[in-house]
Each structure stands twice: as C-alpha cells, then as structure tokens.
Amino acid sequence: MKPTTRPKPPEPRPAPRAANTTRGSTLFEPSKATSRLDAQGTAARQELNDGWYQWVADNCLRDCAPDSMLATMVQAGLDADEARSAITLMNRSPGLLAARKFQQIQRKLESVLANQQKLWELAPHYEQVEKRSGVSRDEFVERYAIGSRPVVLTDVTRDWPAMRKWSPQYLKEHFGHLEVQIQAERNRDPKFEQNKLAHQRMVRLGDFVDQVTGGGATNDYYMTANNEVLRRPEFAPLLEDIGPLPDFCRRGDLARSVNFWFGPAGTNTPLHHDTLMLLHTQVVGRKRWRFISPLETPHVYNYFGVFSPIDIDHPDLARYPLFRGVKVLDVVVEAGETVFLPLAWWHQVSGLDVSLSVSYTNIDLPNDYEFVDPQIRDW
C-alpha cells in the first residue's frame, strides 16, 4: 500500500549481510536511503504511515537486520522510538508470522532447485554451448529438448535460399515500399522490453534499411518478434526462402510460428525467459547469446513478468548479491547457425553485426506451457 499523505520511503538497495554470505542465502541489509532534508540540512520529520509499515514488512521478510532498518528509518526522518517499535511489532504481527510459513515452503523449493543445479553443473563442459551438425530427432528430443540444454545447430540452413539471397539491400529492393512494425526510441527507456508496446512504430522498410545500415551500432531501434511480417501475403517470398527444416519441426506450422528479426549491431535483448521452446536462425550477421539455467530463477530477481533486472555485462552485485556465482553459458551464433532455446532458460542476446534472423516455435513436441509470473513493481 502506498503512503497516504507522503511519498513512499525510498526502498533499500540490498547488499550482502557479511562477506561470507552463502550462495542462495536470503540475508540482506538495506543500504542507507537518501534523507529528506529541511532548510537547516537536518532530516525532515516523517510520519510512520502505511508506506513505511509495508517497507518494514518487506525488509523483515528479506531478513534485513533490525539495526540496519532502524538506521535507514531514522536517517529518513522518523522518530527512533517509533521506528524501533514498528520493527518489533511487525516481527510479532500475525500477518508476518503467517507469511513466514509460506516463506519456509518457498525456501524449501528454492533449495531443491539449488541442489539440482549443483548436479547439472557436474556435467563435463557445463558452461560450454555445443555446436553440432547431424543431430537426429531422437537425440535432439532426449539430449536437448527434454534434457534442457541449449545447442547451436550448424547445418539447418544448408539448403535455404535465404542464405544466398537475403541482405538489407535485398529487403530494400524487393520490399522497401512496404510498412513494417519496429521498436524505436529504446535508449530513452531502461525498461524498453517491458514497455515494448509504447515503442512500436510503423515505418517504410526501405527507410528502416537505410537507418540500420547507416546509423552505426545502436540499441535504439530494432525490428523484433511479433511484427507479423512473415504472416503477411506481401512478404510470402521471404517465407518461401526458408528451406528445409529439421525433422523435429512441423513444416506445416511454420507460417504461424515464425518471427522475423532485423537490426543493427549493438542491439540488446535484456535478460528474460520465454514461455516455450524455440529455434533462432542467423541468416545475416552474428549474435552473442548468454544463457542461465531456469533452476537459477531465485537468483535473478524475477520480480515482474518474465524479466530480470540484471545486466549480465554489468551486474550490480551490491544490489543483486544472489547473482554472485550464477554460471552463465556464452556462445556466438554465426550466420547460417541455429540456436535452440530450451524451455524457460534465461537469456540475454546482443547483436554483434547488422543481422537478419528468424525464430520459430514449430517444434514437434508439446510446446504450450503456463507460468505464474510475478507482478511486483515496487521492489
């Protein structure tokens, strides 16, 4: 609940409680919050309102140290005795005691995931994404789909017309007059992927080709999935350029399961997980894929939807200490190669070159799954 009369107090940025905090621990301390100062430079008096009570409850469930919570509250302008009493009463409250029961169940589930992850990491070359050719249907299903392992297939596009025809200039010459949907102005929004509907724009494909090829490396614009390009009759020749598929894919379902990607070097798809399995083929250019096991979900701070706030390139370990020790699989997918994304694997993708890609979900296995996603916006 938000404060009724004053702004919600600043949320603490968690940091490890001690240098020897173990991986998987939920012990956090809040960092110092910025005080509101009056004209004399002293902390302005705040009321202990509903926003503060929720803040105390949140941090009790995070196992923050009471002294650390008290210091933050006093620095923000709360009376020390009132703040100390609020912390004490919260730890004894029936609501928090009930929440502790569910917390125990959650922590048991997290421990099961953590122990299973330890077993997975015993596999030789766990952190290496294999590059394979000649993978049979049976091996793909058992080793990679059901076995839940990413893999790069190097021979899928061997007979694809797209490999000799597609280029940005080809798109401009044959389809440049058509309008397509892109994502734009992404650089001004740290949550551009979560807010992707707000970044949709319609542009002429020819103009977008010029922008991509002439604008240098950037993440500001990108034609991403769900643009429906390959479902439109005008773009049927592109769909026909996708040649034979592996025998673990249903060719007849391709048209309704394929997405087209086109963007410059420098694009970044933030850390998230998909809700089904897919294949992603590079036709032009290269992309760098980083993968994190779905068993590591408790350690990537998935507070909202399918997204993680962690940037693998620059992880803020003071704010997200549980990410320390998470193993990241790293592979560059070259033109002509196809990466398999197993169910629920976290991934962050970076464009290394101007690239044209297609992704498709018509895998000949059950590929419709349900996730109960959190919708917490105030952590």
Where are these regions (language model features)?
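Eukaryotic low-complexity, mixed-charge intrinsically disordered interaction/regulatory segments enriched
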Residues: G24-R92
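N-terminal accessory scaffold of Fe(II)-dependent oxygenases
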Residues: K2-R17, R23-L27, S31, D81, ...
